A protein has these predicted regions:
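C-terminal capping/lid region of NAD(P)-dependent oxidoreductase domains
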Residues: 164-172
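C-terminal glycine/acidic-rich active-site capping loop/insertion
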Residues: 66-146, 172
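Conserved short C-terminal alpha-helix that flanks the catalytic cleft of nucleotide-sugar-dependent
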Residues: 156
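A general structural signal for well-ordered alpha-helical segments in protein cores
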Residues: 1-5, 128, 132-133, 159
């Protein structure tokens, strides 16, 4: 659900590609997911959730046309650009060279923003406690929930779509 948080900003979003796999699982649970979500005139959302890469520095990675979010159970980090902060640059038609006339690789500086945070605890202690705190304050004081039933329904709809597109054979 973490990567699907972007889904709520795009009311006409739909799953345009999905792939589930059980590469390193002896049972019948998915351990890999690749999901592309698109909406008219919005950035493409590329979600990859994997527990099969032995060298990955993240469990979830969401790539968009303006930035990337990566996360582990311990922390998350986002790197992104803001429209208007990076001016258009003219096309350079001749070969790029350094001061000595040697060819160089083209690059340009981008004004990027980086945010991140470490999580204290895990989904089963801190996450569950925060959910129950929110439920308590919703019932007793009417405070809004961070995740509404409508948001949960949208995430469940995407999950159901992805599972319908990728039926797993029953092993047991």
């Amino acid at each position: 659900g973490m990567g699907l948080g972007f889904f709520f900003f795009f009311p006409n979003a739909r799953v345009v590609y999905s792939k589930l796999d059980t590469a390193l699982t002896s049972g019948d649970a998915d351990d890999y997911a690749k999901i592309l979500i698109a909406a008219p005139n919005k950035p493409l959302i590329d979600i990859e959730i994997s527990s099969i890469d032995a060298y990955s520095s993240y469990n979830i990675k969401v790539q968009g046309t303006k930035g990337t979010l990566k996360a582990t159970p311990a922390a998350y980090e986002m790197t992104y650009i803001v429209d208007g902060e990076n001016p258009d640059r003219p096309v350079i038609e001749e070969s790029l060279k350094d001061e000595g006339g040697n060819p160089i690789y083209c690059w340009e500086p981008l004004n990027k923003h980086v945010e991140g945070e470490s999580f204290n605890g895990n989904a089963f202690d801190v996450g569950t406690a925060k959910l129950y705190d929110q439920l308590y304050y919703k019932i007793t004081e009417g405070r809004p929930m961070t995740v509404t039933p409508e948001m949960a329904a949208a995430v469940i709809s995407v999950i159901e779509t992805v599972h319908a597109q990728n039926p797993l054979p029953l092993k047991y």
